[in-house]
């Protein structure tokens, strides 16, 4: 297939995280053009809006008829497809001030409920990411988030995208994750994270990712090497289960199949798309 690849992966977008993200090798990237890799420094934040901008840029400059969007950040994909409201523009100085304000709240969800019951009703009390984003809007605009979204409605994605997901038998998936974890550790995962953890702020977004956060616990002597491996495998399995459930419940017209079936379906679809 004559195509290019857009990486929708919340870890591969960072520079210097190569092992933990299982980033494509330089050789693989030389043969096939990849977008959205090595775009951010460790202390910068990624979000759905950034990926949407990068995806639109990639679609504009790609010389191929097909752009494959590949990755596990399904929440971002759903946000991009359904549309995103324009977020308020705030300076770095304001971001620090807002973060400080939010960190002083004893119960962020209760506070959100008090200033905007409408938006709070739509967010689960444990969904810290969305609570945080809503509070950022409030502190940046001094407007309840629900009113802000009313004034800045979502704009659905303008391009049609076909969706495919892999269905892998549980024991095979566990075996694959186990082998991948062993390979990562053997390739120098801990050393990679140690170099970054000593260099960047401890609250940097990538340090919360699976494979990274467990390595940090190992470096802080809270886990043995065996426990580190087991924790990465266990947490990756849980994530895979969540991703699978999310994909099946949140996307319409999702083609699910084995590696062979999905490959065949993508090839058939790409041929008809090019003809069309």
From Swiss-Prot:
Root EC class: transferase
Superkingdom assignment: Bacteria
Interaction with substrate tRNA: annotated segments: 9-12
Site (described: Interaction with substrate tRNA): 73
Catalytic activity: adenosine(37) in tRNA + dimethylallyl diphosphate = N(6)-dimethylallyladenosine(37) in tRNA + diphosphate
A GO biological process held by the record: tRNA modification
Alphabetized UniProt keyword annotations: ATP-binding, Magnesium, Nucleotide-binding, Transferase, tRNA processing
GO molecular function, one term: ATP binding
EC number: 2.5.1.75
Cofactor(s) required, per the database record: Mg(2+)
PANTHER family: TRNA DIMETHYLALLYLTRANSFERASE (PTHR11088:SF60)
Function of the protein: Catalyzes the transfer of a dimethylallyl group onto the adenine at position 37 in tRNAs that read codons beginning with uridine, leading to the formation of N6-(dimethylallyl)adenosine (i(6)A).
Annotated family: Belongs to the IPP transferase family.
Known partners and oligomeric status: Monomer.
NCBIfam families: miaA (TIGR00174)
Full protein name: tRNA dimethylallyltransferase
Native source species: Helicobacter pylori (strain HPAG1)
């Amino acid at each position: 297939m004559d195509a290019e690849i857009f990486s929708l992966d919340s870890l591969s977008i960072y520079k210097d995280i190569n092992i933990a993200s299982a980033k494509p090798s330089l050789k693989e990237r030389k043969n096939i053009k990849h977008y959205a890799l090595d775009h951010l420094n460790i202390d910068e934040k990624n979000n759905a809006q950034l990926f949407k901008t990068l995806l639109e840029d990639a679609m504009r400059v790609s010389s191929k008829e097909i752009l494959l969007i590949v990755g596990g950040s399904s929440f971002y994909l759903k946000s991009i497809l359904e549309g995103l409201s324009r977020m308020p523009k705030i300076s770095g100085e304001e971001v620090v001030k807002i973060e400080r304000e939010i960190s002083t709240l004893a119960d962020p969800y209760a506070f959100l409920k008090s200033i905007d019951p409408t938006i709070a009703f739509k967010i689960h009390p444990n969904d810290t990411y969305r609570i945080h984003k809503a509070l950022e809007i409030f502190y940046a605009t001094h407007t309840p988030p629900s009113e802000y979204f009313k004034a800045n409605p979502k704009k659905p994605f303008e391009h049609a995208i076909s969706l495919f997901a892999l269905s892998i038998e549980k024991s095979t998936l566990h075996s694959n994750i186990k082998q991948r974890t062993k390979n990562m550790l053997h390739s120098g995962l801990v050393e990679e994270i140690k170099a970054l953890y000593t260099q960047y702020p401890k609250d940097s977004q990538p340090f919360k990712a699976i494979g990274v956060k467990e390595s940090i616990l190992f470096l802080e002597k809270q886990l043995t090497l065996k426990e580190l491996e087991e924790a990465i495998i266990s947490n990756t399995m849980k994530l895979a289960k969540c991703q699978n459930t999310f994909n099946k419940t949140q996307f319409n017209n999702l083609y699910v199949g084995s590696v062979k079936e999905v490959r065949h379906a993508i090839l058939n679809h790409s041929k008809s798309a090019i003809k069309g």
